[in-house]
Structure formats: structure tokens, C-alpha cells
Amino acid sequence: MIRFAPRLALAAALAAISAIACAQEITLRLVSAFPENQFYVKRTLDWIADVNKDGKGILQINFIGGPKAIPTFEVGKAVQTGVVDIGFSTGAFYTNVMPEADILKLSETSAADQRRNGGFDLINKIWAEKGNMRYLAKVVEFTPFHIYLNKKIDRPDLTGLKIRITPVYREFFQSMNAQVMTTAPGEVYTALERGVIDGYGWPIHALFDLNWQEKTKYRVDPGFYNAEVSLIMNLDKYKSLTAAQRDYLDRKARAYEAQNDFWKSYNQSEAKRQAEAGIQVIAFDAATSKVYVEKAKEIGWANAIKASPQYGPQLQKVLAK
């Protein structure tokens, strides 16, 4: 028996080392507010695969699904309360957590600018205080919103039209006399098909992911605001990570964000694809277009400051040009 003692001691030591190594790896649960077939989500799944490939022994991410796992407008609350660790969403989908989430649509400075001008730190201060969240990275930007319609208009007037919205568009569309209704993205196709809505607000891209081009006749130009889709994390979970895990996750999130110039060329290709699918452009004249975009901005900031008197003006300093 004495002869085997060193072997047993060695085996015990190796087992202990293995246990310590396993303890240093953590698996985080991520849910998407967007349907799994959307291009946003496919890009994020590629990012998750990269995180997991390089993060063995440090950090892994488990994608638990899209709105079928947690409904679109409940993802923010799920992140806030720790039901999930990371959410992939846009701020308009979690204004039920904090009104400031929707202000990010007004960004004229880039995510890179905001990391330099204090914007990223301010966002994280607000998100931590009001949402128990860490704002990891913005991974969609440089992307305008548009109005898509099945009925032609010749001026910025939506009188008599039923338009699907999220908080992104509510006040702006109402200022043009639209009848507005809020639905999750997954419900829009059926609403168009049944004539429940006459149009919707949406970015320049991602119609084809959801087959909305089949039920869409017109896109109104110019675009307005700036689509924002981000990775948000439960703050308690973020703080519980080791320094090495936090550094790794932050580094990978920043690398994902650094790819955002991709959206500039992608949006051009999507506009061309829409034209090829038969979606016609309704273009206002130069003077009307200028007033239209300025009105969207004016209404956006007025409502942002009304909703958040404390942080609205501070965000304006770092988001607006």
C-alpha cells in the first residue's frame, strides 16, 4: 500500500488542478430579442462561436434562443433581473426598464466616438443605475430607419394610415397623424397580410430576413435616426466574473463592435435588393426632406429630455453632433 501512496497523491493533485481549471471557466446564457433567422442574430451566433473557440477554460456563451425563449419586449427585464446573463436587443425593446434605452436611436456620433468622448461611460453609468446592466457593445449602427408602406403618399402625412411602431417611431409618426400600434417583429408579416396595418417603421435592412418584402410596396426616403442593436449584460453577473473573464468578454465585445463599418456597404446592397424586389421609393423634394429629417430629430430629442430630464441633456452632449 505504501508503494501506491505517491501515485494516489499525484492523482489527487491532478484532479484538484483540473477542478480549479474547470471552476475558472464560466458559461453565460444569451437570449436574442430578434428572431433566430434574422441576419443580426446570425452574425451574433458567429461571434458566439468565436468567443467559445478562443475562450476555452475562461468563458463560454450558450445561446438559448430568440423570442420563443423569452418574448421580445421582456428581454430587457430578463437581463435586469438575471433570468438571463446577456441580451441581444435594441433599446426600443426595453423602455419598460428605462426610458433612456430609446435615446440611443438619436446617435450621430459613432460607437467608437462614444468610447472616446465619454459617451460609453455615461451609458454604462445610466444602465447600471437604472437597469442593473452592463452595456457591452453596440454592434449595429450607421443604419437609418424608414417608413415602409402599402399605400402611396406624396408628402409627410400619414393621416388615415395604420402603422406598426416600436417606441423608436411613436411620437414622430404621430406628428404625421398616423394611427400607431406596437407589435413584435415576428407579428408584422401577418398584420400586413391581413390588412391590420398599412405599413411599418424599420431600418433600411432586414426586410428579407422576415419576408416583409412580399407585403411591402413602398419605402419612404430619406431615412432618419440611427438603428442601434447591442449586447447588454446583467450587472451582478458581470461583476461576478473574474478579472480575466471580464477582460476577455470586453475584448471580444469591442472586437465585434469594431466591425460596424460593415453596415454601410450592407445597407447599400439591401436598398438595391429592395428595388429588385419591386419596392418603390417615395422620395420627397430636397426642402421637404430637410424639414422631415430635422423634425424627426427635434421630436426625438424633445421626448428624450422630457422622458429623462436628468440624463437626456447629458446624452445629447455625447450622442448629437
Task: Give the location of each predicted region.
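Bacterial N-terminal signal peptides that target proteins for export
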Residues: 1-10
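Absolute protein N-terminus
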Residues: 1, 23-24
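Hinge/lid segment of periplasmic solute-binding proteins
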Residues: 118-132
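N-terminal secretory/targeting leader peptides
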Residues: 10, 24-113, 128-321
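Secondary-structure junction/capping motif
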Residues: 5, 38, 98, 117-122
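N-terminal signal peptide c-region/cleavage motif recognized by signal peptidases
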Residues: 16-23
